[in-house]
Amino acid sequence: MPHSDELDAGNVLAVENLNIAFMQDQQKIAAVRNLSFSLQRGETLAIVGESGSGKSVTALALMRLLEQAGGLVQCDKMLLRRRSRDVIELSEQSAAQMRHVRGADMAMIFQEPMTSLNPVFTVGEQIAESIRLHQNASREEAMVEAKRMLDQVRIPEAQTILSRYSHQLSGGMRQRVMIAMALSCRPAVLIADEPTTALDVTIQAQILQLIKVLQKEMSMGVIFITHDMGVVAEIADRVLVIYQGEAVETGTVEQIFHAPQHPYTRALLAAVPQLGAMKGLDYPRRFPLISLEHPAKQEPPIEQKTVVDGEPVLRVRNLVTRFPLRSGLLNRVTREVHAVEKVSFDLWPGETLSLVGESGSGKSTTGRALLRLVESQGGEIIFNGQRIDTLSPGKLQALRRDIQFIFQDPYASLDPRQTIGDSIIEPLRVHGLLPGKDAAARVAWLLERVGLLPEHAWRYPHEFSGGQRQRICIARALALNPKVIIADEAVSALDVSIRGQIINLLLDLQRDFGIAYLFISHDMAVVERISHRVAVMYLGQIVEIGSRCAVFENPQHPYTRKLLAAVPVAEPSRQRPQRVLLSDDLPSNIHLRGEEVAAVSLQCVGPGHYVAQPQSEYAFMRR
């Protein structure tokens, strides 16, 4: 049945009175209530709200992906204008018809790329599949287009990446592959669910610009779901604020940022960390927590002086980690990914050392190598005077009680067959630390400390939002009272209010128990708030390391300055053409087997502040 008369000429999408619910214990639990909005051709609508507010399930309902997950969707109207200009009612489409709509007319970039990419197919095959299905292209034509899309999202060595699998890529690389896949068929509507959450600030800036360029070329409507108000200020035309499944405020981006009316909107904006807010301060500070009832009332931030003098709890010297790449008829190793090259640093009890850098710079690999989750080819890792890199498997397991890891992708690191209570109890059982009754009480306490309810222990991972799942992973890491926590993008999936609570929790635990954090992140505003020291990594090497004050207030290396310049600012009226971005000609850390790359030489430029010498800045700094 034609619906052209029901959709305004300029609109590509219109939704009226959307209601979403889930059945739990034979009760209907409402997730979204009476939500209405429209999207114009070439417009970007940002949907913002806390984790669990209903943002992602709204997107899944539009894609008709909720029914198979047990969602109950009711809507008075859900109209889409296809690329052919035909208007269809999405709720009336059969499963077969929706397969032709998804990808071609409406595409989605999902929040967790590791679980969205098929692990048994190469990256090239997955991108080409959509192109072949919707554009009637041959396999060869589809692969050429797939490479072009990878080039557009600035993946270096795109031809090589086509033949690799998702587990061989970093989190940011996987997210860029997802973006390339979604944009490959030039849809009429693009739904982006936290598309830049896993990306560092420089690549995030490139992706936001890329989406805007393609949007202008194709007059594509974009629904941008995010908790990053800096990104909202940069990309949105209109903003829809959702609180507990209901729309509480909508307006242009200027209206929302400059004259917010609802207390929840004001609270969201007040909770946004601002880069530069720590200028002149020596120690980490708690985030001010803003309540909905009193958005202007702030908890006084307390400086955290926690570093213990003496011997480092963790010492890393000349760490080298490489991954083999096979090719040829005999499948021999011909090249290697130089993921980490001669990295050295110390970590003291009660200290937070942040590793920052682009996706693929070696941050996550460094963290994993410290626990021997990936094997290194050289260097020393010393924990409390004991070399980790030479331990037997039995002794290594005992040591892992004192070093815990919070992984980047929360859904992939939780067992879907276990309740979250069992997942949190598991490390306690493995190490035989607490009897069952005490363990259950410990789980309840941990869940409350990370902002969840004790009764959530009986639920499964798929019943939680991405941010809630990350809080579960943090609770599990804290269960054993470790001496060191390696946090790999631990708060990147959290909205601003919960992020502040989690950072404050980490700071409190650091103050109470002297925990040392290796904090891996691309969020420079959060890094500035939580760090004692900062190390900047590029192509597997540290190019600048020093105190937070030194690195943020007096950055010496060109790459550090570029990272800071790329941070989005929560001010829509600010013009950003002057922002410095990396060259499109990204260098590669893939080299022929046996080829050695010169290690950078760090020069002291201030107390505890070391920077790569100019002559050591080899091809990775394209000026």
Swiss-Prot record:
Output the Gene Ontology cellular-component terms.
plasma membrane
Bilayer topology: Peripheral membrane protein
Q: What is its main location?
A: membrane
- E.C. numbers: 7.4.2.10
Question: Which domain of life, per UniProt?
Answer: Bacteria
Task: Report domain ABC transporter positions.
Answer: 15-269, 314-564
For the keyword Repeat, the answer is yes
Where ATP is bound, by residue? Answer: 49-56, 357-364
GO MF terms, alphabetically ordered: ATP binding; ATP hydrolysis activity
The reaction(s) this protein catalyses? glutathione(out) + ATP + H2O = glutathione(in) + ADP + phosphate + H(+)
- Keywords of this entry: ATP-binding, Cell inner membrane, Cell membrane, Hydrolase, Membrane, Nucleotide-binding, Repeat, Translocase, Transport
Q: Report the PROSITE patterns cross-referenced here.
A: ABC_TRANSPORTER_1, ABC_TRANSPORTER_2
What processes does the entry annotate via GO biological process terms?
A: peptide transport; transmembrane transport
Q: Where is the protein found, in the record's own terms?
A: Cell inner membrane
Q: Quote the InterPro entries the UniProt record gives.
A: AAA+_ATPase (IPR003593), ABC_transp_ATP-bind (IPR050319), ABC_transporter-like_ATP-bd (IPR003439), ABC_transporter-like_CS (IPR017871), Oligopep_ABC_C (IPR013563), P-loop_NTPase (IPR027417)
Q: Which Pfam families match?
A: ABC_tran, oligo_HPY
> Record keywords: Translocase included?
yes
What is stated as this protein's family in its record? Belongs to the ABC transporter superfamily. Glutathione importer (TC 3.A.1.5.11) family.
Instruction: Identify the NCBIfam families for this entry.
Output: PRK10261.1, PRK10419.1, PRK11308.1
Q: How does it assemble?
A: The complex is composed of two ATP-binding proteins (GsiA), two transmembrane proteins (GsiC and GsiD) and a solute-binding protein (GsiB).
**Purpose of the protein:** Part of the ABC transporter complex GsiABCD involved in glutathione import. Responsible for energy coupling to the transport system.
Please report the name of this protein according to its UniProt entry. Glutathione import ATP-binding protein GsiA
Source organism per entry reads: Shigella flexneri serotype 5b (strain 8401)
Q: What is the lineage of its organism?
A: Bacteria, Pseudomonadati, Pseudomonadota, Gammaproteobacteria, Enterobacterales
Gene that this sequence comes from: gsiA
